[in-house]
A protein has these predicted regions:
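Short acidic capping loops at alpha-helix termini that bridge into adjacent secondary structure
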Residues: 189, 220-224, 276-283
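N-terminal helix-turn-helix DNA-binding module of bacterial transcription factors
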Residues: 1-76, 364-367
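Flexible loop/turn connectors
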Residues: 241-367
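Hinge/beta->alpha junction and helix N-cap segments in small-molecule ligand-binding domains
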Residues: 85-94, 113-121, 167-177, 193-243, ...
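Periplasmic-binding protein-like
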Residues: 126, 133-140, 191-194, 248-259, ...
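Short beta-strand segments enriched in small/hydrophobic residues
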Residues: 25, 30-35, 72-87, 181, ...
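Alpha-helical recognition/docking segments in bacterial nutrient-uptake
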Residues: 1-14, 18, 75-180, 184, ...
Length: 367
């Protein structure tokens, strides 16, 4: 009897197709079918035409593997727990996209939870994910304060915790790139929209800015800085706090915002104040989210490779789980300055003109 007319012997009463169903259908052993479908080492000794028969039968019979049962047998779930501060903002979305891409390519799954700045949820979610059998954790823009029970990689965690690998941007180098760019364009009075205090990147990024400003001889005026302290991840946040700085009527020729999404909002506030970008006020952001290139004008920004950071995090946690590589406490990521149309030479007559400053060579790497 041909396979196209053979009855499904060994089929379960619920109609679900199992390895035994396929084995009986092809007059093969379940072990042979399993080896082919799992592409195990044993399959290397199986003739090619037999492999093709198994794969064709699996497609024809609509076979769906039971990953949960497989994980119980092998004591593996191939599942990672991802704990993020936000998943709807461009930063978190791009990092998680990189995580997903690498995990998918390596036959891992992931469960994602979002704590929205509620520290009490971190422990709850950690325990919940462990109860569901995750083999490791990746945190995104979340401070890990205690040693984890499972392999853990933190993207922008900024905490030195034993057993946790931190993937961090070189914020001092990033600040050097941004401020040196503005300095060389003649900007001396620069306004700053500082990041929210609950964001794990905020303190390191601001410390880098202050250090580099001192190296350049730039004065950071208290009245030209404001800390954004609301739980918002839209351009409206940047618009609101840029309006606060503008209302102080202190002249400035450039504005450096904590991230791109708030920089885009700040551009709107500057324009609503009757000023032009970049002719009157240059604006620079941080991250290089996809929208930065399509803002009007195109946003100059410091790029941190968020997609690649997610991929590196996924690769690192898998390496730790499968003990492929030795533990490393920190992986440093280099930023890149992306110059677009939102920055230009400081030459606006309505603001206090700055005297020409002697050009100085400022190294891109911190001393």
């Amino acid at each position: 009897m041909t396979e196209s007319h053979r009855e499904l012997r060994g089929a379960r009463k619920d109609g679900k197709v199992t390895l035994k169903t396929i084995a009986d259908y092809l007059d093969l052993t379940p072990g042979t079918v399993s080896a082919v479908l799992n592409n195990s080492r044993a399959s290397q000794a199986i003739p090619e035409h037999t492999k093709n028969r198994v794969l064709e039968a699996a497609r024809k019979l609509n076979y769906r593997p039971n990953y949960f049962a497989r994980s119980l047998r092998g004591k593996r779930t191939h599942t990672i727990g991802v704990i993020a501060e936000e998943i709807g903002d461009p930063y978190g979305a791009m990092v998680i996209s990189g995580i997903e891409q690498h995990l998918r390519e390596n036959n891992f799954f992931f469960l994602t939870v979002c704590h929205r700045h509620d520290q009490k949820l971190l422990q709850t979610y950690s325990e919940m994910l462990q109860s569901r059998g995750v083999e490791g954790f990746i945190t995104v823009d979340t401070s890990v304060l205690a040693a984890p029970a499972l392999p853990t990689v933190a993207v922008a965690g900024h905490q030195d915790v034993p057993g946790v690998t931190n993937i961090v941007l070189d914020h001092r180098l990033a600040a050097t790139m941004a401020l040196k760019h503005l300095y060389e364009l003649g900007h001396r009075e620069i306004a700053f929209l500082r990041g929210q205090p609950f964001s794990s990147d905020s303190a390191d990024r601001w410390a880098g800015i202050c250090h580099v400003a001192q190296e350049l001889g730039l004065r950071i005026r208290p009245e030209l800085q404001v800390q954004m302290d609301e739980m918002d991840s839209t351009p409206q946040l940047g618009y609101k706090f840029a309006k606060i700085v503008l209302a102080r009527k202190i002249p400035f020729t450039a504005l450096f915002s904590y991230n791109d999404i708030t920089a885009i909002g700040a551009i709107g506030a500057v324009r609503d104040a009757g000023l032009r970008v970049p002719e009157d006020v240059s604006v620079i952001g941080f991250d290089d989210i996809p929208a930065a290139a399509f803002a009007s004008p195109g946003l100059t920004t410091v790029r941190q490779p968020l997609l690649r950071m997610g991929q590196i995090a996924a690769r690192t946690v898998i390496d730790q789980i499968e003990q492929r590589a030795p533990f490393v406490p920190k992986i440093a990521i280099e930023p890149e300055l992306v110059v677009r149309q939102s920055t230009s030479v400081a030459a606006t007559p309505h603001l206090h003109a700055q005297p020409a400053w002697p050009a100085r060579k400022i190294p891109l790497s911190p001393a």
